[in-house]
Every structure is written in C-alpha cells, then in structure tokens.
Amino acid sequence: MRHRVGGRKLQRTSSHRLALFRNQSAALIKHEQIITTLAKARELRPYTEKLITLAKKGGLANRRLAHSRLLDDTQLKKLFDVLAERYKDRNGGYTRIIKAGIRASDAAQMAVIELVDRDTTAKGQDSGPVQVEEQENEEA
C-alpha cells in the first residue's frame, strides 16, 4: 500500500529525477520563467520554493545546503543576493504556475512556471559568467 506517499515519479529513477529538479530549478532561477509539462512544474514548485526559503534565512550552513541542491555557483549567488532580498517580506508562494495548452507532438499538458514579481528582462538572457574577448595585439 502506498498511503501518504507524496511526489510523482515522472517515469524516472530517483537520481534522474533529482538531476531534473536541479537543472530546472537552476533554469528557473536564471531566467525566472520556464516552460515545461504541468506535472514537472507541479513537482518543481516545492523544490524551488524551499531553495528560496533557505536563501531568505541566509547563513553559511544554508548556503552550503542550497549549493548541494542547486550545484550552480552563479545561480546560487543570484538566489542569495537577489531573490532573497526580493522576497524578504513574502511568506511563501514565490512561484506561479500558468497552464499553457497542449503540446502538439504528444498531447502533454504544458505549463509556464515563473517567479512572482519576476524581472521581465531576465527572460532569455544569459546571466552566467561574462565572456571576455581577448584583444589581439596589432603590433606584429
């Protein structure tokens, strides 16, 4: 019997599911809005909200805990510096799920998961490390 067993398996092993949540939460923190299936969005929501709550609490131990769940230093910095400050007065409910129709190829229900009060300029931009182009010496 599986009474009170929470969470969806999403047709994946536990390690694959964990990798999926890590990658999608990093993408959500980076772009502040992603499109995925409704089932994945519903499972991603508590994972991401717990990360934001850890960031709001601050501290070295919480930063290390968040790093073990996120594994992306640039998104970890954004999580603790930008998002924790943005949601300091909000008690939960940091994400929103909006249904986005049905995918044509396999009829899967799609959804947009986004951060509430998001920065609209973050969508589609690369907030990763800045690529510095090397300037060639013209003294040849």
From Swiss-Prot:
InterPro entries documented for this protein: Ribosomal_bL17 (IPR000456), Ribosomal_bL17_CS (IPR047859), Ribosomal_bL17_sf (IPR036373)
Cross-referenced Pfam families: Ribosomal_L17
Keyword Amino-acid biosynthesis appears in the UniProt entry: no
Gene3D superfamilies: Ribosomal protein L17
GO annotation (BP), single: translation
Keyword entries, A-Z: Ribonucleoprotein, Ribosomal protein
A GO MF label: structural constituent of ribosome
PROSITE patterns given in the database record: RIBOSOMAL_L17 (PS01167)
CC terms in the record's Gene Ontology section: cytosolic large ribosomal subunit
Segments of this protein annotated with the region Disordered: 119-140
Endpoints of the signal sequence: none
Family statement drawn from the similarity comment of this UniProt entry: Belongs to the bacterial ribosomal protein bL17 family.
Subunit description: Part of the 50S ribosomal subunit. Contacts protein L32.
Name of the protein in its database record: Large ribosomal subunit protein bL17
Protein's organism: Zymomonas mobilis subsp. mobilis (strain ATCC 31821 / ZM4 / CP4)
Source taxonomy: Bacteria, Pseudomonadati, Pseudomonadota, Alphaproteobacteria, Sphingomonadales
Gene for this chain: rplQ
